[in-house]
Amino acid sequence: MKRRLDDQESPVYAAQQRRIPGSTEAFPHQHRVLAPAPPVYEAVSETMQSATGIQYSVTPSYQVSAMPQSSGSHGPAIAAVHSSHHHPTAVQPHGGQVVQSHAHPAPPVAPVQGQQQFQRLKVEDALSYLDQVKLQFGSQPQVYNDFLDIMKEFKSQSIDTPGVISRVSQLFKGHPDLIMGFNTFLPPGYKIEVQTNDMVNVTTPGQVHQIPTHGIQPQPQPPPQHPSQPSAQSAPAPAQPAPQPPPAKVSKPSQLQAHTPASQQTPPLPPYASPRSPPVQPHTPVTISLGTAPSLQNNQPVEFNHAINYVNKIKNRFQGQPDIYKAFLEILHTYQKEQRNAKEAGGNYTPALTEQEVYAQVARLFKNQEDLLSEFGQFLPDANSSVLLSKTTAEKVDSVRNDHGGTVKKPQLNNKPQRPSQNGCQIRRHPTGTTPPVKKKPKLLNLKDSSMADASKHGGGTESLFFDKVRKALRSAEAYENFLRCLVIFNQEVISRAELVQLVSPFLGKFPELFNWFKNFLGYKESVHLETYPKERATEGIAMEIDYASCKRLGSSYRALPKSYQQPKCTGRTPLCKEVLNDTWVSFPSWSEDSTFVSSKKTQYEEHIYRCEDERFELDVVLETNLATIRVLEAIQKKLSRLSAEEQAKFRLDNTLGGTSEVIHRKALQRIYADKAADIIDGLRKNPSIAVPIVLKRLKMKEEEWREAQRGFNKVWREQNEKYYLKSLDHQGINFKQNDTKVLRSKSLLNEIESIYDERQEQATEENAGVPVGPHLSLAYEDKQILEDAAALIIHHVKRQTGIQKEDKYKIKQIMHHFIPDLLFAQRGDLSDVEEEEEEEMDVDEATGAVKKHNGVGGSPPKSKLLFSNTAAQKLRGMDEVYNLFYVNNNWYIFMRLHQILCLRLLRICSQAERQIEEENREREWEREVLGIKRDKSDSPAIQLRLKEPMDVDVEDYYPAFLDMVRSLLDGNIDSSQYEDSLREMFTIHAYIAFTMDKLIQSIVRQLQHIVSDEICVQVTDLYLAENNNGATGGQLNTQNSRSLLESTYQRKAEQLMSDENCFKLMFIQSQGQVQLTIELLDTEEENSDDPVEAERWSDYVERYMNSDTTSPELREHLAQKPVFLPRNLRRIRKCQRGREQQEKEGKEGNSKKTMENVDSLDKLECRFKLNSYKMVYVIKSEDYMYRRTALLRAHQSHERVSKRLHQRFQAWVDKWTKEHVPREMAAETSKWLMGEGLEGLVPCTTTCDTETLHFVSINKYRVKYGTVFKAP
């Protein structure tokens, strides 16, 4: 089973990676569940130095069944034990793997007894276990994700080891093999055992707990009374653990205490103590293998994801340099093979590749990549220490050198403790035995305590002697401290190497010997003026590790760098640069090759064009390089021809061979002479008089050979460009054909409208409202002229179908030429068979003399066979605001959808042809007016330059030629590729819409065949014709409600007819010259009431309501006894009835019709009934109105007269009432009050009374103007 490493990492580290192109291949070595050789451990006794150790073997006792073998191949990675490790530990390498162990004091008699023994883990163990989890829970991915979350929480120290055991046991309930297999990753002293009753026994250092798999809290049990030595399978630990040493203190940011005195002991923690609470933690060793990167500086636990992270980081960093990545894999593979051979030989074999050599090779491979090399150094800490010791470089000397390729960290310019870098911290042993503890937070800016001993404490040799000489030479402690400050700011990359030399020149300038040694030590050269910081070179690939998708956005092309990103230093910036230059926003391009959208990727034809251009460019570079070398050597040859023989013998060339570039000529010669190029170049420099003519002849010969090849390639490239140019521009054609075939399927068209219908139903149910009424689809027929072209193509294909009967062909012809134009308010087509008479042959049967025709009908049948001779839709063609109504089944619906798509695509091609005609005319007009050139249609520049073949079709004939090509494609006279190429030549990138024209027409013909042959389809057509005679299939929109009863009857009949399939309501609406087709899927499922009595009552109610004669004799009798009408209304009704009777007697029916012609009415008032209460509710925005056209004019004319008469009647009533009820004194007081007089306490004001006329009536208008109110003091 092959595995991608990033698959294992992505659930936990999804936010840390941006994108890994392709699969992250595993390292090429055989996957093994367990190491074949016994693991080798180290024990440190109290009498030993930390750099030495005793090696001994322990027979492994692994549970092989818990870790099934996998056949996948993976690279070296961490197999980390998830433990609560909170104090630094000594690291000692051995062979190919580093096993970390803590030594505790023990009696001298048994130095080995009491040592913590544990197994060696590899990344293969962890990945195999994950494989088993995936396989076991393949249908439950959440379980796998929960397991990774548990591991992530443990890594962040959110839970302790017992908590992990409890959660894993609960998660893998019912899978004892997985629970037991987790023992492989537990620290010594912990063990899980599954009982038969689903109880889980957990052995911890000092106690045994039982955990039921249903999640009950652990129950402590007495510890075992017989201490036993733990095996590699994490056997139970002794009841009394060994005393623990105190936490080691960090003496330097990158150093780790290797050993502490055994006399200092602290009691162990309880087994279930939190890992965060006390400073002293229980002893939990950590197992590290090759490829391990534990973050030990912050005392964080280790897990195998770190190794996978590191592998992915390397591959991302060297994406453009796959050779480096492959070389790295080869180094690890070779080292692992050597270690395997050494183990199998049992100590009789000495590995050819040691850890130091592995580190040195990787260091050369990852030069200038400080972070990668530093992190790799964590996997080989002793090799790293050996390299550092071999260099014998003090810490501050390393800072001076600014060598970022090693693992030495620079001091920080703050008083805070050094934090781990982005890629992990680094571990380095002190070269001597033990170091007294120092402060954890060194104040690095305080340089007053700096001394030569501090500077050279970890180094020796000439570097230490140099600092001693500098201190003695400067004599002043302050000057020496300032010198050290210069080194510190250089170490922080605040200044460059050249600036450092300038800063220390006042100190060392007086001592040339020291100054020269210092510059040589820095690698400083006088000619180097511009320098690239190693830190910047080391972080070239950091951009690949930033997750830009989660960063702040500015538009679609820019992302803001995270605040945690460390900006590179720049010493050349001025304050103005810092103010105006951008350090936050970075460009975030979206490459077409990396895009997940198919439409944005390059097509195969674009790739062909690009490949041609790449090949052309590459050959041009070869030719121009060769030509440049020829010119240089020709100049040298001319120069030599003017020299004497002695001068020629003395003449020499430099590395540029007489030119200006060394690289160009060297590449040209290497291309020809390959491995012998170095000898040729050496001969040209030392003896040009002999070598130049020979090399020049060879170069010219190659020039002719390559020029000839270029001419041959130009023909090939031109053919490929001509073949793929138009196809490369068409980025939609490839996907369009495949997708359009799916869209045109009957099932897709039905699913489209059914999904819209279901969405409406669900929305109405959620909102607890009625289902909205209206069409589900609205389609447009923009040009009626296209209907003729569509009908011609369809009939053309129908005639050539031998499976369709003669009568059915004629019915289809009538539908396309008569019925469809009537529905769409277009002019009918001609049924004459002129085309058939011209194309088809007449076969005379000699025996009977009968006339036969192939693939068609033998002439137009008599008029009696016409299906659509006279329809009401014909009369609506020239009118506006009209509609046609047609209830159809599935076949008719699919046909109308396909027909609309066909008309739409024909219209787009026709419109494009018209646009190209206009562009051609404008171009000719411009050439004639501006350039004074008058050219023919076929005299385009491309044709004259023979870059394009002249076309047989003029631009004006593009659309007719397109229709002819469609007919030829339907007949099989041309293939689809030729058809598509011709379309691209005519319509360029707009031609893709017609690529599936043949499939579309074939689908239409299949539906037409069903329409004329299927029984239900024929009945649908017959029902339309029958209801058309009754006036129920359309008319004017403003009189639609007058036909509502007829249309409802038509709908009920259609629903009954199509009870077994969908029923669609098609409305063809013509408004302002545009034809719109609306389609509504009707709900034909009848809701049967549970109570038959209620159903009967509802039916009776509807019938009585719809009946015009709703007044029963009983109701009339009841109303006569107890009238509920106003007498005046009864009088008006009787008067109208008498007037109607009188008109009928006088026979004035003609005048009545004439009177009704001058009336405008709208009957669109709608109402709904609530089934529960029979309550009628009017629909919003529905209304009725009726008025005579002369009523408004008559109202204007009589308005004044009527207004005066009404006012006089009202005024007479008011005067009469006032005379009876209002005395004169009250009327006088009212007049005074209106004028602001007569009453005290009124606000001072001035009132005026003016007489105005409003609506032909005189009125009094009072205006009040208030004065200022003065208050008494």
From Swiss-Prot:
Residues 252-266, 284-297, 412-425 have a biased composition (Polar residues). Expressed in the developing brain, with highest levels of expression detected in the ventricular zone of various cortical regions. Pfam families: PAH (PF02671), Sin3_corepress (PF08295), Sin3a_C (PF16879). Residues 1138-1156 have a biased composition (Basic and acidic residues). Residues 888-967 are annotated as: Interaction with OGT. There is a cross-link at K122, K134, K563 (Glycyl lysine isopeptide (Lys-Gly) (interchain with G-Cter in SUMO2)). It is found in: Nucleus; Nucleus, Nucleolus. GO terms for cellular component: chromatin; histone deacetylase complex; kinetochore; nucleolus; nucleoplasm; nucleus; Sin3-type complex; transcription repressor complex. Residues 119-196 are annotated as: Interaction with HCFC1. The modification Phosphothreonine is found at T284. Residues 523-850 are annotated as: Interaction with NCOR1. The keyword Lipid metabolism does not apply. Gene3D superfamilies: Paired amphipathic helix. GO terms for molecular function: chromatin binding; DNA binding; protein-containing complex binding; RNA binding; RNA polymerase II-specific DNA-binding transcription factor binding; transcription corepressor activity; transcription regulator inhibitor activity. Residues 205-480 are annotated as: Interaction with REST. The modification Phosphoserine is found at S10, S277, S832, S860, S940, S1089, S1112. Residues 1-23, 87-110, 205-297, 398-446, 1136-1156 are annotated as: Disordered. Residues 524-659 are annotated as: Interaction with SUDS3 and SAP130. It comes from the Eukaryota. It is linked to Witteveen-Kolk syndrome: An autosomal dominant syndrome characterized by global developmental delay, mild to severe intellectual disability, and facial dysmorphism. Additional features include short stature, microcephaly, joint hypermotility, and small hands and feet with digital abnormalities. Brain imaging shows dilated ventricles, thin corpus callosum and, in some cases, dysgyria or polymicrogyria. Acts as a transcriptional repressor. Corepressor for REST. Interacts with MXI1 to repress MYC responsive genes and antagonize MYC oncogenic activities. Also interacts with MXD1-MAX heterodimers to repress transcription by tethering SIN3A to DNA. Acts cooperatively with OGT to repress transcription in parallel with histone deacetylation. Involved in the control of the circadian rhythms. Required for the transcriptional repression of circadian target genes, such as PER1, mediated by the large PER complex through histone deacetylation. Interacts with ARID4B, BRMS1L, HCFC1, HDAC1, HDAC2, MXI1, SAP30L, SAP130, SFPQ and TOPORS. Interacts with OGT (via TPRs 1-6); the interaction mediates transcriptional repression in parallel with histone deacetylase. Interacts with BAZ2A, MXD1, MXD3, MXD4, MBD2, DACH1, NCOR1, NR4A2, REST, RLIM, SAP30, SETDB1, SMYD2, and SUDS3. Interacts with PHF12 in a complex composed of HDAC1, PHF12 and SAP30. Interacts with TET1; the interaction recruits SIN3A to gene promoters. The large PER complex involved in the histone deacetylation is composed of at least HDAC1, PER2, SFPQ and SIN3A. This is Paired amphipathic helix protein Sin3a.
